Swiss-Prot record:
GO terms for molecular function: bHLH transcription factor binding; DNA-binding transcription activator activity, RNA polymerase II-specific; DNA-binding transcription factor activity, RNA polymerase II-specific; DNA-binding transcription repressor activity, RNA polymerase II-specific; enzyme binding; protein homodimerization activity; RNA polymerase II cis-regulatory region sequence-specific DNA binding; RNA polymerase II transcription regulatory region sequence-specific DNA binding. Residues 8-21, 95-107 have a biased composition (Basic residues). The lineage of its organism: Eukaryota, Metazoa, Chordata, Craniata, Vertebrata. The keyword Magnesium does not apply. Its main location: nucleus. It comes from Bos taurus. The keyword Nucleus applies. Residues 68-92 have a biased composition (Low complexity). Phosphorylation by PLK4 disrupts the interaction with MDFIC and leads to translocation into the nucleoplasm, allowing dimerization and transcription factor activity. Residues 1-23, 56-112, 172-203 are annotated as: Disordered. Transcription factor that plays an essential role in both trophoblast giant cell differentiation and in cardiac morphogenesis. Binds the DNA sequence 5'-NRTCTG-3' (non-canonical E-box). Acts as a transcriptional repressor of SOX15. In the adult, could be required for ongoing expression of cardiac-specific genes. The modification Phosphoserine is found at residue 112. This is Heart- and neural crest derivatives-expressed protein 1. It holds the Pfam family HLH. One of its GO terms (cellular component) is nucleolus.
Amino acid sequence: MNLVGSYAHHHHHHHHHHPHPAHPMLHEPFLFGPASRCHQERPYFQSWLLSPADAAPDFPAGGPPPAAAAAAASYGPDARPGQSPGRLEALGGRLGRRKGSGPKKERRRTESINSAFAELRECIPNVPADTKLSKIKTLRLATSYIAYLMDVLAKDAQAGDPEAFKAELKKADGGRESKRKRELQQHEGFPPALGPGEKRIKGRTGWPQQVWALELNQ
């Protein structure tokens, strides 16, 4: 139904019963009232009141111009001017391959780390077979075991032959025992006993002669 025709007919019928001084603005078929400002907006009212059948065929109601629709279809929703559809498809393919290669690389890295930790657990001795070690526990045990081995190597380098090492420990114990006896005798007022091969040296008493000798040499 044409809004323009129905409104124009109703407008003339209304003024037939109520005579009114003729005014050129009142007989305009596309005006809603006598306001003069509406005359400037006449083209906009015409475009709003026309029915879809009366509209221009080049611009269908509710859709963009054909040229704009063709441009949007050729570029696509995410396309930018200057890019062809083929270039966009190639770019999308590269991105898809890059995303697919990421999980594979991460999986290989995880497998490599797990296998390295499994080998490290086998090198740690005295671990029960049913014990499940986490990665941090494995690293801590490996660090402790390395420190233990370094300590063993250092002791072997200092001691040399184990039999000679035991003999040196006995000599050291005997020396400490004789020194303790001499200090006890000095404390009780008796002259210190001489050990085998020692000679009494004249000098100050009350302290071991070795201590005095060290003080004099300084």
